[in-house]
């Protein structure tokens, strides 16, 4: 992400102003503003506990990855608002991820080059092998933003930025913007944070730890090129989340997940 400040054009509502009418700010009606993306390549997003040699992947993007995709795309479209205000607004918004109909994970061993433990002598990089997982997603990904928790100006900003998003996380997990819409309620195909609620996943669900913007998230802290350190529970939080994808089939080198039938 280029480290620069976007110029301000016009006046935006302050981040503290909440949407008094959850159906305002975007065409159609409904509390949830939902963006739909079609995966065009294999998806991979390492779990928070993954190591460089064992790269297990999540099945879906996290809220953090979705929000960072909007921040990155804001630079691409030369968005005329303040990036700092966008990050602060996204930090306050509840986001749910709509899962695809099916996900197939391939388990692979690949050759990589990594820095040696002794960096003072020898080559800068040495050959090694690593475990990697990649996901084939059958169906669209949907990102639902709760407008009742958003500043009034955010809906229009997201709609302007959304078409410029073409990858998730690190470059490689490419997606194609399909469109957006509004819904009053979300269906069972969307993630649900546990937040202390005792829910037992059924055969068509699983619990995963997904990250999100923290309450004090700022562009300076989240920017990879900034010297400001990112702090857990302040700038970035991790939440146990119910993901409506359950294991339905396993075989040599793959695992298949699907939404609960019906």
Predicted regions and their residues:
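Conserved active-site/ligand-binding neighborhood in enzyme cores
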Residues: 2-262
């Amino acid at each position: 992400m280029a480290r620069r400040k976007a110029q301000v054009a016009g006046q935006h509502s302050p981040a503290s102003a909440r949407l008094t009418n959850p159906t305002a700010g975007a065409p159609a009606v409904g509390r949830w503003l939902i963006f739909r993306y079609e995966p065009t390549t294999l998806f991979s997003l390492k779990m928070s506990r993954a190591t460089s040699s064992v790269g297990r992947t999540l099945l879906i993007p996290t809220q953090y990855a979705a929000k960072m995709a909007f921040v990155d795309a804001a630079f691409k479209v030369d968005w005329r608002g303040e990036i700092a205000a966008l990050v602060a607004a996204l930090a306050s918004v509840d986001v749910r991820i709509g899962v695809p109909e099916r996900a197939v994970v391939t388990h692979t061993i690949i050759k990589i080059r990594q820095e040696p433990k002794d960096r003072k002598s020898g080559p800068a990089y040495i050959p090694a092998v690593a475990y990697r997982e990649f996901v084939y997603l059958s169906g669209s990904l949907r990102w639902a933003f709760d407008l009742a928790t958003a500043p009034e100006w955010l809906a229009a900003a997201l709609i302007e930025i959304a078409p410029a998003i073409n990858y998730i996380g690190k470059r490689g997990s490419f997606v194609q913007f399909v469109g957006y819409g509004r819904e009053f309620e979300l269906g069972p195909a969307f993630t649900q944070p546990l937040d202390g609620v005792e829910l037992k996943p059924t055969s068509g669900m699983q619990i995963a730890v997904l990250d999100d913007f923290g309450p004090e998230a700022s562009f300076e802290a989240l920017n990879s090129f900034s010297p400001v350190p990112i702090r857990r529970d302040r700038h970035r939080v991790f939440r146990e989340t119910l993901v409506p994808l359950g294991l339905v089939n396993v075989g040599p080198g793959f695992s298949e997940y699907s939404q609960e039938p019906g």
